[in-house]
């Protein structure tokens, strides 16, 4: 584990604990709070794996939704969808990334790529992929985080 990441993760956890202790309550519905906790856990999980996160919750005004995380895994640009669940009784977390969600993520990724600076080399595009990170926060069990690299591609027919 990278020491700086562990320290940052402990600091964030301590701040969350202090906020709860002082009575701070979010106005968000519980499922959105669970999702935010999962995205934070996924962020630190990926950082420990060596990913360089360049954006969190990236939005483009004309497209609904967001890209949860955008990160470099070596020389590969990754668009990462995080799905968090507090139960395994229903469908898997990754099954929530259905055809419509994949279409939205592809649209957002195209918009993200358009706003990047022009590369020095004409027609250069870095290798890219769409990953899914699943986070399970089951009562009485340690958090379970899994990375599914290249979970789907650019084609609509996957």
What are these regions (language model features)?
Residues 56-61, 133-136:
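Short, solvent-exposed loop/turn elements at beta->coil junctions and helix N-caps
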Residues 2-9, 116-158:
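Domain-level recognition of nuclease-like catalytic cores that cleave nucleotide substrates
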Residues 59-63, 122-124:
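A short beta-turn/loop motif at secondary-structure boundaries
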Residues 83-139:
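Catalytic cores of nucleic-acid endonucleases
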Residues 3-57:
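Acidic-basic catalytic patches of nuclease active cores, encompassing PD-(D/E)XK
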Residues 53-55, 79, 130:
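Hydrophobic residues on conserved beta-strands that form the core of alpha/beta folds
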Residues 42, 46, 67-90, 105:
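Conserved catalytic cores of phosphodiester-cleaving nucleases, focusing on short active-site segments
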Residues 37-41, 65, 100:
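A generic structural signal for residues located within well-ordered alpha-helices
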């Amino acid at each position: 584990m990278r020491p700086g990441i562990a320290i940052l993760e402990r600091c964030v956890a301590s701040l969350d604990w202090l906020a709860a202790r002082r009575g701070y309550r979010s106005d968000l519905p519980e499922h959105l709070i669970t999702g935010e906790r999962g995205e934070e856990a996924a962020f630190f999980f990926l950082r420990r794996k060596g990913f360089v996160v360049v954006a969190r919750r990236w939005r483009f005004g004309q497209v609904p939704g967001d890209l949860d995380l955008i990160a470099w895994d070596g020389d590969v640009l990754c668009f990462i969808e995080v799905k968090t669940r507090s139960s395994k009784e229903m469908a898997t977390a990754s099954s929530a990334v259905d055809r419509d969600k994949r279409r939205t993520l592809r649209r957002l990724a195209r918009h993200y790529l358009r706003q990047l600076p022009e590369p020095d080399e004409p027609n250069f595009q870095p290798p890219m992929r769409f990953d899914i990170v699943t986070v399970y926060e089951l009562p009485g069990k340690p958090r379970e985080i899994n990375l599914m690299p290249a979970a789907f591609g650019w084609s609509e027919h996957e």
